[in-house]
Amino acid sequence: MSTVTLLGERLAEVGTEFVYGGETDACEGCPYREQCLNLTEGRRYRVTGVRDSGTLECAVHDTGVTAVEVEPAPVLANVDANAAYAGSKASLVGPCPYTECPSHEFCEPDGADFDEEYQITEVVGDPPHDYCMLDRELQLVQFAAEE
């Protein structure tokens, strides 16, 4: 089910994914707060439609905001290979200090927390790294979009 919200003009394109960061100090006193701050903080969303409603001024987005339709988006993540089964639940294996690793974005994905379990909808396959610097056996999976 899609939700109508306001999004920065530069991000307002069908297919764009983002993690909602919540309210900032600049939002205080804004007349559009109700329409803009209606998503769940920390959740990943995908823009599914852009409304033809014009641009509104915004203290956060320098080019203003526009109305868009968004839906929760799935998250790609690396999990323990022994827990990687479609339909099962898994959690992230823990933080990784190797930020240059090609898998880092999947070991610490935006939109997922270390202390939560997520439903696996698909086992994508091997992660993009050749070997894990922490000796973890990992599989790349897709977590279900949170409703």
Curated annotation (Swiss-Prot):
It comes from the Archaea. It holds the Pfam family UPF0179. Belongs to the UPF0179 family. This is UPF0179 protein NP_3406A. The lineage of its organism: Archaea, Methanobacteriati, Methanobacteriota, Stenosarchaea group, Halobacteria.
